[in-house]
Swiss-Prot record:
Gene3D superfamilies, per database record: Cysteine Rich Protein (2.10.110.10), Homeodomain-like (1.10.10.60)
Source species: Xenopus laevis
Protein name: LIM/homeobox protein Lhx1
Basic and acidic residues bias (residue ranges): 150-166
Stimuli inducing this protein: By retinoic acid and by dorsal mesoderm-inducers including activin, derriere, dvr1/vg-1 and nodal.
Keyword annotations: Activator, Developmental protein, Differentiation, DNA-binding, Gastrulation, Homeobox, LIM domain, Metal-binding, Neurogenesis, Nucleus, Repeat, Transcription, Transcription regulation, Zinc
GO biological process: anterior/posterior pattern specification; axis specification; cell migration involved in gastrulation; chordate embryonic development; muscle organ development; nephron tubule development; neurogenesis; neuron differentiation
Domain LIM zinc-binding: 4-54, 63-117
Positions of region (Disordered): 131-185, 318-366
Length: 403
């Protein structure tokens, strides 16, 4: 006797069905969900029989939008690795059904926003940022009691000015298609109250802000943002006024450049007269005063000295004359007296100063450092014809400047 796999009763009918290698009554082969008879094909799971629709609905791929099974006959859309019904693949803002190839933005892996709504919403959020506040910002929350924290956020929330917070009744007409965020309208009386409070206390505490909120009827966050913007505006005005004052002082009274020589005292970098800075030098061989005094007719009687008494070799170059070779005698100059003085200098004993070999034309005679110390700028004398007690003609003096 054959027993039915569904009802476990003996099969006495003329016909039977063989499903999953087991015998079934014809009336027992039915869907366990909808109780419909299965004649052509059936689906089995865990010993139970299902029709096609119920089987895919229960065990098939789930729709990521509605979490229901997807029938094989249903049209679906895929986004990333998820499958959606056509009715579930819509924009969450405008409920528009999205088509294949259309740009969209996915939120939370199972919600979609079309491109137009996303851009419009993003622009509106940026436009509303001047007055919108979040609870995560401690400087803008009503619970903030520290005025120093309020001042630290002045520059960040300085997007609202008194003009923006004033009365503006034509905002909706100027916005066009894009809707701007709501603006806080501050009336003239409320603005006067806030300005008076700002003049008294630029950084009000929470208690003062609560009193202002009760007096004006405005939100505490709006009052706090207004004070921050007002402080920022005052700082900007002070900076601009200080900059304008400095610029005005610079252009109105510029520094006048004076000549360099007029600002220097005599004896400084540029003294009176050429080469006068040598006059300040004193040593045991160079006395104070000018080293370039010249007397064409001989020194005055009061200043007449013999060459031996002179502390240095007199120079015949007047003050301010460029140094160079003196090849011609100066008019009015008596070479005999100068020759006599130079002869007396040259005629010292050999022990006092070394002498070059005699009778050598053009030989150089150097002054001894033991007698004259460090040689002055004109330390070499070239005399043609050697040295003698009397010079028959004016000596030609080649003077070499060493600087």
């Amino acid at each position: 006797m054959v027993h039915c796999a569904g009802c476990e009763r003996p099969i006495l009918d003329r016909f039977l069905l063989n499903v999953l290698d087991r015998a079934w009554h014809v009336k027992c082969v039915q869907c366990c969900e909808c109780k419909c008879n299965l004649t052509e094909k059936c689906f089995s799971r865990e010993g139970k029989l299902y029709c096609k629709n119920d089987f895919f609905r229960r065990f098939g791929t789930k729709c990521a939008g509605c979490a229901q099974g997807i029938s094989p006959s249903d049209l679906v859309r895929r986004a990333r690795s998820k499958v959606f019904h056509l009715n579930c693949f819509t924009c969450m803002m405008c409920n528009k059904q999205l088509s294949t190839g259309e740009e969209l933005y996915i939120i939370d892996e199972n919600k979609f926003v079309c491109k137009e709504d996303y851009l419009n919403n993003n622009n509106a959020a940026k436009e509303n940022s001047f007055i919108s506040v979040t609870g995560s910002d401690p400087s803008l929350s009503p619970e903030s009691q520290d005025p120093l924290q309020d001042d630290a956020k002045d520059s960040e929330s300085a997007n609202v000015s008194d003009k923006e917070a004033g009365i503006n009744e034509n905002d909706d007409q100027n916005l066009g298609a894009k809707r701007r965020g709501p603006r806080t309208t501050i009336k003239a009386k409320q603005l006067e109250t806030l300005k008076a409070a700002f003049a008294a206390t630029p950084k009000p505490t929470r208690h003062i802000r609560e009193q202002l909120a009760q007096e004006t009827g405005l939100n505490m966050r709006v009052i706090q943002v207004w004070f921050q913007n007002r402080r920022s505006k005052e700082r900007r005005m002070k900076q601009l006024s200080a900059l304008g004052a400095r610029r005005h002082a610079f252009f109105r009274s510029p520094r006048r450049m004076r000549p360099l020589v007029d600002r220097l005292e005599p004896g400084e970098l540029i003294p009176n007269g050429p080469f006068a800075f040598y006059g300040d030098y004193q040593s045991e061989y160079y006395g104070p005063g000018s080293n370039y005094d010249f007397f064409p007719q001989g020194p005055p009687s009061s200043q007449a000295q013999t060459p031996v008494d002179l502390p240095f070799v007199p120079s015949s170059v007047p003050a301010g004359t460029p140094l160079g070779a003196m090849d011609h005698p100066i008019p009015g100059h008596h070479p005999s007296s100068d020759a006599q003085r130079f002869t007396d200098i040259m005629s010292h004993p050999p022990g006092d100063s070394p002498s070059p070999e005699p009778n050598l034309p053009g030989s150089m005679h150097s002054m001894s450092a033991e007698v004259f110390g460090q040689s002055p700028p004109f330390s070499s004398l070239s005399v043609n014809g050697g040295y003698g007690n009397h010079l028959s003609h004016p000596p030609e003096m080649n003077e070499t400047a060493v600087w």
